[in-house]
């Protein structure tokens, strides 16, 4: 990965900076973005030196912003570390179908829905269609390159993206995005007290 070309386009770097500041609110994190051939879906990995890998897909600026936000939120939630732990547990319990097959796919869906929920607060409601389009572009790219590349990002993405029920659930949730006003949050908090 250290030999891979880094993103050099000013436009992409500006989109990345805007997405980064919306997620982390500070410049203390060092996250590299690498666009490369050979992967089918965007992916974020690494706990101490996180990296975002982007496939060779032409996204619009807003779609790219949504993709980068999505991956940065995965990094913020430390989803990659959770997946590694889940993979380890699956290896230990390889004989148990619930743990080795069902639990990882459920965890993947929960992580994706949690990221979608987190994005609701950042992405303007009018851009939810761009977010959904970026998911569809990624799915089309992953399915068209399915036979050529079966890397780990493809495996996780195809398990999650090819499941129509999961996609329907995500798109339904994205369609229902509504920005919550701070006053509503305050009222809810006051009601709890």
Spell out what each predicted region is.
Residues 1-193:
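Membrane-embedded and juxtamembrane structural elements of multi-pass membrane proteins
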């Amino acid at each position: 990965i250290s030999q891979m070309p880094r993103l050099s386009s000013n436009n992409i770097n500006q989109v990345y900076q805007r997405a980064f500041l919306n997620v982390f609110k500070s410049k203390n994190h060092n996250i590299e973005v690498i666009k490369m051939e050979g992967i089918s879906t965007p992916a974020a990995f690494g706990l101490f030196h996180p990296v975002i890998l982007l496939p060779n897909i032409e996204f619009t600026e807003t779609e790219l912003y949504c993709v980068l936000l999505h991956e940065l939120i995965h990094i913020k939630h430390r989803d990659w570390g959770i997946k590694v732990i889940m993979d380890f547990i699956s290896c230990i319990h390889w004989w148990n179908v619930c743990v080795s097959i069902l639990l990882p796919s459920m965890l993947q869906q929960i992580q994706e829905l949690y990221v979608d929920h987190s994005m609701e607060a950042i992405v303007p409601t009018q851009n939810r269609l761009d977010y959904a389009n970026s998911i569809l572009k990624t799915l089309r790219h992953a399915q068209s390159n399915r036979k050529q590349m079966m890397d780990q990002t493809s495996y996780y993405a195809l398990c999650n993206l090819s499941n129509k029920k999961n996609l329907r659930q995500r798109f339904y949730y994205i369609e229902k995005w509504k920005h919550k006003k701070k006053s509503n949050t305050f009222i809810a908090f006051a009601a709890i007290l």
